[in-house]
Amino acid sequence: TAVAQASILGLYDPDRLKRPLIRVEGSQRGEGKYRVATWEEALDHIAKKMLEIREKYGPEAIAFFGHGTGDYWFVDFLPAAWGSPNAAKPSVSLCTAPREVASQWVFGRPIGGHEPIDWENARYIVLIGHHIGEDTHNTQLQDFALALKNGAKVVVVDPRFSTAAAKAHRWLPIKPGTDTALLLAWIHVLIYEDLYDKEYVAKYTVGFEELKAHVKDFTPEWAEKHTEIPAQVIREVAREMAAHKPRAVLPPTRHNVWYGDDTYRVMALLYVNVLLGNYGRPGGFYIAQSPYLEKYPLPPLPLEPAAGGCSGPSGGDHEPEGFKPRADKG
């Protein structure tokens, strides 16, 4: 998603593909011989090849891969209708999977494609491994600019003096691979200096005593040995976060697959947010709301699951009478 800076290059690249291309009949893969085709011809060509493969090898011989907004139809619905259980989103395992699993464990729901951060009302933002302005979505960069305009203080944890670091009031050049140690030390300070949101934690969380016991020895002095960030700086940032709670936030980034401990690292990051009491509050994480829509008369779907492992729509697969979805399903 490095479109923030590269989009202009892609738009005007002389080699940008603007129309469908089909390999010239008789040429071999690797020769680079293609001809321009219309969209209708290209789609018909793909459909014809898919039908030929299914006829010869069966529907399972085709795998479907998708990514991003709108891929539901391509990764979920189409494979089920086609009859292939082979569908996946491989990019997720390289990007957001750790944060989605961590969020499910900590918050009880995934983060989702667009990070639900209330940038506009945040007053203290800590970016850890978050290369905003370099490899994030344009809309997120716009939100970040709005936060700066509204006077938010920014801390950037990054071995490089990044684009975001140039906008920060603190830059913490951490030793690569030690982010979890820093997060654990922040948790230690928030708890043992009695800086966390006690009412919020008591009302909305479980397991606090276990977390407190777990981080007992993860002091800033311990973290300094691993991160090469001075213990006093670690303490100061934790205290500044606490002073701005609940409008202090550590946004979970994309591209989370780093060192193998990624899910646990993101869990530690989310624990800091919980201790700041910012989940579901202005300046922190907002909870996306879905409006309730009255029942609409739709014709039954006759399509049954087409193959083992597929969960295609079914004529008998419908919500019970009177069912109302939760407003916060997001």
Say what each PLM segment does.
Residues 177, 181-247:
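P-loop NTPase catalytic nucleotide-binding module
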Residues 55-59, 87, 192-196, 220-224, ...:
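Intrinsically disordered or highly flexible coil/loop and linker segments, enriched in small
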Residues 92-95, 205, 238-241, 287-290:
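Short linear loop/turn motifs
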Residues 61-70, 225-229, 253-260, 292-293:
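Conserved short loop/turn motifs at secondary-structure junctions
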Residues 80, 184, 188, 239, ...:
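Generic alpha-helical structural context detector
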Residues 2-195, 222, 230:
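N-terminal export/assembly segments and adjacent metallocofactor-ligating motifs
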Residues 68, 72-73, 205, 209, ...:
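An alpha-helix initiation/capping motif
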Residues 241-330:
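A glycine-rich, hydrophobic/aromatic-adjacent loop/helix-cap motif
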